[in-house]
C-alpha cells in the first residue's frame, strides 16, 4: 500500500476516535454524583485576618511555673469534688467537706516516696483551718511548667486576665450568652460590649467574663477557657474581638447584618452570611444539576438550609 494511502487511513481512524472521546466527555455533567463537602471546605471567612490582626485579638496569659510558686499563692475551688483529690486526714471529715467557692492558699510541698522509691511531690494547701495535701505521684523534674491541679483555679491568672480586659470595649462573637444566674440566654453576636469584670469560673471553664451590651445595656456573661485545652471554641479569640467585625464585611447590607447579629436567616443570603449567622454546619451535601448547583447545609439541632448557586432559598 502506498505511503499516502496509509496516512489517509490513519487520519480517518484517529479523527472519529477523538470526536467520539469529546462527545463522551461532554456527557459527564456531574448530575450523576453527589459531592460531600467537608467542614474545611465550608469554614471560610470572607476576608482573611492578617498576622497583626490575629495577634491583636489574642490574649497571652503568662504561665506561673510550679517551681516558682510562693507560699500564699491563692487558688479558687471550682467544685466540691475537690475533696476527692486530697489525701485522707484526721483533721476533717471528707464526706462532709464543702470547699466549692472558697479560696485555698499554697503552703509549700514535701517529698514522699512510692513503691519505686521515687521522691514524689506532695503539695500542701490551707484554708486557714485545715491543711489539705495533694499527692502528685510525680517527681519535681516530672512536673511540667504548666502543671495544674484538678478543681483549683489559679487566682493569679484570673486577676491577670481581669487587668487585661476589665473596663475595655470589645466585640462579642457568639450569641450564646449566660445570665447572672448562669443560665443560657439568647444574646447577640458581633456587637460592642463593655467588660465589667473577670471572675473564676467552674471546673470546665476556669474563667467567667461579665459584660454589658453597649447598645441595649443588657448584662450577661460568658464562660472562657485558657490555652492548652481542646475546647478551642471557648477561648478568648473565639469569643471576643478587639476590632469591629462588621468592618470586615462591607458588602453585607445592614438588613442582612441585623439578621446575622440576631442569629437569624432569610432567603437571599449568601453561604458566608449564613455561616456568620449560624456558624459552620455539621455537614454539607452539594449536588450539581443541569440548572445549577444545589447545596444542603445540616446543623446539629436538626435544622437544614437549601442553597441554589450559593444563595439561600429556604
Kindly label every feature range from the protein language model.
Residues 5-17:
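Bacterial N-terminal signal peptides that target proteins for export
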Residues 86-88:
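A composition-biased, non-transmembrane "mature-region" signal
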Residues 74-76:
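Conserved long hydrophobic alpha-helices within structured protein cores
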Residues 28-71, 93-101, 108-314:
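Residues within mature, well-folded domains
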Residues 24-26:
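C-terminal motif of bacterial Sec signal peptides marking the signal peptidase cleavage site
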Amino acid at each position: 500500500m502506498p505511503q499516502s494511502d496509509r496516512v489517509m487511513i490513519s487520519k480517518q481512524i484517529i479523527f472519529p476516535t477523538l470526536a467520539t472521546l469529546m462527545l463522551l466527555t461532554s456527557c459527564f455533567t456531574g448530575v450523576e454524583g453527589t459531592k460531600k463537602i467537608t467542614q474545611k471546605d465550608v469554614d471560610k471567612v470572607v476576608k482573611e485576618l492578617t498576622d497583626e490582626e490575629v495577634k491583636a485579638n489574642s490574649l497571652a496569659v503568662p504561665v506561673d511555673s510550679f517551681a516558682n510558686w510562693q507560699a500564699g499563692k491563692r487558688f479558687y475551688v471550682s467544685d466540691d469534688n475537690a475533696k476527692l483529690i486530697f489525701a485522707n486526714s484526721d483533721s476533717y471529715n471528707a464526706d462532709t467537706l464543702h470547699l466549692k467557692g472558697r479560696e485555698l492558699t499554697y503552703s509549700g510541698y514535701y517529698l514522699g516516696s512510692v513503691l519505686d522509691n521515687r521522691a514524689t511531690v506532695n503539695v500542701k494547701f490551707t484554708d486557714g483551718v485545715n491543711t489539705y495535701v495533694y499527692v502528685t505521684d510525680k517527681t519535681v523534674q516530672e512536673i511540667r511548667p504548666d502543671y495544674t491541679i484538678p478543681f483549683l483555679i489559679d487566682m493569679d491568672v484570673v486577676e491577670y486576665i481581669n487587668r487585661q480586659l476589665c473596663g475595655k470595649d470589645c466585640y462579642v462573637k457568639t450569641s450564646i450568652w449566660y445570665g447572672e444566674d448562669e443560665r443560657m440566654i439568647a444574646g447577640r453576636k458581633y456587637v460592642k460590649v463593655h467588660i465589667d469584670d473577670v471572675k473564676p469560673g467552674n471546673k470546665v471553664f476556669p474563667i467567667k467574663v461579665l459584660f454589658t451590651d453597649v447598645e441595649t445595656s443588657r448584662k450577661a456573661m460568658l464562660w472562657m477557657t485558657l490555652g492548652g485545652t481542646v475546647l478551642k471554641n471557648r477561648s478568648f479569640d473565639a469569643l471576643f474581638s478587639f476590632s469591629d467585625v462588621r468592618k470586615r464585611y462591607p458588602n453585607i447590607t445592614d438588613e442582612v447584618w441585623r439578621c446575622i447579629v440576631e442569629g437569624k436567616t432569610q432567603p437571599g443570603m449568601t453561604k458566608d452570611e449564613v455561616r456568620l449567622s449560624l456558624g459552620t454546619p455539621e455537614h454539607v451535601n452539594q449536588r450539581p444539576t443541569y440548572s445549577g448547583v444545589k447545596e444542603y447545609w445540616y446543623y446539629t439541632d436538626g435544622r437544614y438550609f437549601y442553597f441554589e448557586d450559593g444563595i439561600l432559598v429556604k
